[in-house]
Amino acid sequence: MSDILKISRVAVWKDIKKIRSLGYKIESKQNLGYRLVDSSELLLPWEVTQNLNTEFLGKRVYYFDTIDTTQNFAMKIASKSNENGTVVISKKQTGGRGRMKRKWKSPAGGIWMSIILHPKFDVSYATLVPIATSLALCIAIEKILKIKPELKWPNDVTLKGKKIAGVLIDT
């Protein structure tokens, strides 16, 4: 590997160490090299975007280890540019919030994200966006994970009576 990359074996080892710190499982065998055993469980930008088949959603991804809220960062971006479909992800939020500015605990281990959308429909339909988004999330969870979540009015997704997701819309 060091010959192909034209770097020292120590440099390869340091890079492998960095890759492991991102959650990738890498096996090493003396005199043979390294082998990727399993990918990271983190929502890393390149993991999110590599197989996307969308026109605009997720074409740009911002990733943070910790942030106050992904929503605040997304609002700043949205106010300065027209980045439609941009996704903001963080491993942990220190100031997560829900509807009516209620505190929302967002420790490491969850999926904390915001998506910037500039929809092309009449603003009177905006009230339908949270329920439509929650419904789409339920359908995706059921299809991919083969479990049946439920909607709790107006913006929550629950599983066995426990909240697993909430959809918050800011304008």
Residue ranges and their predicted role:
Residues 136-171:
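Acidic (Asp/Glu) carboxylate-rich active-site/surface patches
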Residues 1-143, 163-165:
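N-terminal lobe of the biotin/lipoate ligase/transferase fold
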